[in-house]
From Swiss-Prot:
Reactions mediated catalytically: Thiol-dependent hydrolysis of ester, thioester, amide, peptide and isopeptide bonds formed by the C-terminal Gly of ubiquitin (a 76-residue protein attached to proteins as an intracellular targeting signal)
UniProt domain OTU: residue ranges: 147-284
Source species: Homo sapiens
Location of region: Variable-loop: 219-229
Keywords (A to Z) from UniProt: Acetylation, Disease variant, Epilepsy, Hydrolase, Intellectual disability, Protease, Thiol protease, Ubl conjugation pathway
Any one GO MF annotation of this record: cysteine-type deubiquitinase activity
Active site positions: D155, C158 (nucleophile), H277
Lineage: Eukaryota, Metazoa, Chordata, Craniata, Vertebrata
Residues in coiled coil: none
InterPro entries, A to Z: OTU_dom, OTU_OTUD6, Papain-like_cys_pep_sf, Peptidase_C85-like
Subunit structure: Interacts with the eukaryotic translation initiation factor 4F complex.
Name of this chain's protein: Deubiquitinase OTUD6B
Residue list for modification N-acetylmethionine: M1
Region ranges (His-loop): 267-277
EC numbers: 3.4.19.12
Length: 293
């Protein structure tokens, strides 16, 4: 009986993992579809919204049917196994027992599904909402400088990846890992320049030395999001100014004391419906084409 239950949990976990993978792949596909449709093409944008909703509905139905089929098959296998070993046991009117582990997995899967649905809803809403307006403003600001946004993945490393991308244009090959490590080292060796600006979110008090040390360790060892302090450290490390372009505020330049050509990042408050995000920039495609013709 224990072997049957273990196999049941293994099969369900594998199915739920595949479902999560398929959902992530669908979100990536949807993002690609959105990027392929011009922002000012309202007719195609409307059709895109309908297509996205259809794709998500079809996947949700497919996953529900697969999960129901697995549970049905598992139930039948369990009954067959018990019948072989305990021939005199009457199974009628005895509902299948659900283990605590299975309940936890189902609850976790339900929460994950709810989260992904909220993200998908935010994505669709932002086609005409704050994200769309922010993107339009940034596109105009950058176009005036013959630039456009270069998308960077939203994975916690976006600021460092945007810096990495900008450095490639200068033939400087520093990876995200190296940038994070050097940032933490610089901040640890210049504590007085950074500690006063960090406060405990629960108490409002300035970080203790131990909390500051943990903050620096997280820069190296986790996907901790980088902000103004990390940009300040990077400008000193690279001895290069860093310009941050925003939709509703003037550009911010960190490291103005340096004379090199600045690295340019785009700061977005409403990216992906998930909060703040950094992107890189590149030259406008049509400008590059004209120069090469």
């Amino acid at each position: 009986m224990e072997a049957v239950l273990t196999e049941e949990l293994d099969e369900e976990e594998q199915l739920l993992r595949r479902h999560r993978k398929e959902k992530k792949e669908l979100q990536a596909k949807i993002q690609g579809m959105k990027n392929a449709v011009p922002k000012n093409d309202k007719k195609r944008r409307k059709q895109l919204t309908e297509d996205v909703a259809k794709l998500e509905k079809e996947m949700e139905q497919k996953h529900r049917e697969e999960l129901e089929q697995l549970k049905l098959t598992t139930k039948e296998n369990k009954i067959d196994s018990v019948a072989v070993n305990i021939s005199n046991l009457v199974l009628e009117n005895q509902p299948p027992r659900i283990s605590k582990a299975q309940k936890r997995r189902e609850k976790k899967a339900a929460l994950e599904k709810e989260r992904e649905e909220r993200i998908a809803e935010a994505e669709i809403e932002n086609l005409t909402g704050a994200r769309h307006m922010e993107s339009e403003k940034l596109a105009q600001i950058l176009a005036a400088r013959q630039l456009e946004i270069k998308q960077i993945p939203s994975d916690g490393h976006c600021m460092y990846k945007a810096i990495e991308d900008q450095l490639k244009e200068k033939d400087c090959a520093l990876t995200v890992v190296a940038l994070r490590s050097q940032t933490a080292e610089y901040m640890q060796s210049h504590v007085e320049d950074f500690l006063p600006f960090l406060t405990n979110p629960n108490t409002g008090d300035m970080y203790t030395p131990e909390e500051f040390q943990k903050y620096c360790e997280d820069i190296v060892n986790t996907a901790a999001w980088g902000g103004q302090l990390e940009l300040r450290a990077l400008s000193h490390i690279l001895q290069t100014p860093i310009e941050i372009i925003q939709a509703d505020s003037p550009p911010i330049i960190v490291g103005e004391e340096y004379s090199k050509k600045p690295l340019i990042l785009v700061y977005m408050r409403h990216a992906y419906g998930l909060g703040e995000h950094y992107n890189s920039v590149t030259r406008l495609v049509n400008i590059v084409t004209e120069n090469c013709s």
